Amino acid sequence: MRYLIFVFLFLSHTIQAQLKKNDLEPNFTERKKNLLIIESSAYSLALVGLNQLWYKNYKKSSFHFINDNNSWLQMDKFGHLTTSYFVGVLGIKTYQWAGFSRKQSIWIGGLTGTFFQSAVEILDGFSDEWGASTGDLIANSLGSMFAISQQLHWNEQKIQLKFSFYPSKISNTNTELFGKNIIQKSLKDYNGQTYWLCLNLEDVFNTNSNLLPKWLNFAFGYGADNMYSDANNDSREIGERQFFLSLDINTDKLNISNKFVKNVINLIGFIKLPMPTVEYSKGKLNFHNLYY
């Protein structure tokens, strides 16, 4: 989950870019310049910071790839995909705000997640402890293309990828692996993470029946539990996959007049809200009054 350092820095510069001014007549030339400076600075600082904080004490090696596609029942891959998607959506909005053309905003902004996360893979590739993951690179690209393709086709994100977390029952069995506090656990405890695909069926299929409000989405989730190790888990030996059906709120469809509040809500829009949920796992159906 080291790539999340990039996400936090990107969120930081996005907040600065979008909330710093509220010009009636925006200076797009200045906005473009400021955006590129902030983004370049965030990228450089993250690389230096990661190298000092994470890689410094490990041996270097020649660049190499690894195959970790069986680890954590692919939960880490869903993490890469969802993060790349969300950073791409923020990138599109930020480049639009800065005055770039529609196609430039979609392609350059949409690829921001892949660009930032791929830098981590390069550092991994030169580390003897890890290695560049082809699965991670593919997941990064798919997340970006999911954001880009929707923006090109619909000019909005009708189908959203989201994230939710609640500490798993086994998170305290190995605090070095799963984290010592709630922030660390939210990044490292794959057993407590759930990744969601959220959509409004009427909106996607253009039925215009008005049976459901535009802000109410159906949410289809994927998670896994009882994974005690990061060593290429085999689904036949350890861990159980979980599938969920729930509801969600599309914050983009809420009628919020306050621009500051709207921007802040959009910045945390990747979080799936607690809702009644049906879970299928171990061959059984379970109902949760509220699942997060």
PLM feature spans:
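N-terminal targeting leaders of membrane proteins
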Residues: L4-K77, L81-F100, Q157, T207-P213, ...
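Small-polar-interrupted transmembrane alpha-helices in polytopic inner-membrane proteins
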Residues: A42-Y43, S105-G125, S141-S144
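Alpha-helical transmembrane segments that form the membrane-embedded catalytic/substrate-binding core
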Residues: H80-V87, D124-Q151, F243-F244
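Transmembrane beta-strands of outer-membrane beta-barrel proteins
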Residues: T112, F116, I159-L161, K214-F220, ...
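Glycine- and acidic-residue-rich phosphate-binding/metal-coordinating active-site segment common to enzymes
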Residues: T134-G192
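Residues on the lipid-exposed face of transmembrane beta-strands in outer-membrane beta-barrel proteins
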Residues: M145-F146, Y195-L201, L245-T251, F287-N289
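Transmembrane beta-strands of outer-membrane beta-barrel pores
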Residues: F165-K169, Y222-Y228, T251-K253
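A conserved mid-domain beta-alpha-beta active-site/ligand-binding segment of alpha/beta enzyme cores
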Residues: T175-D225
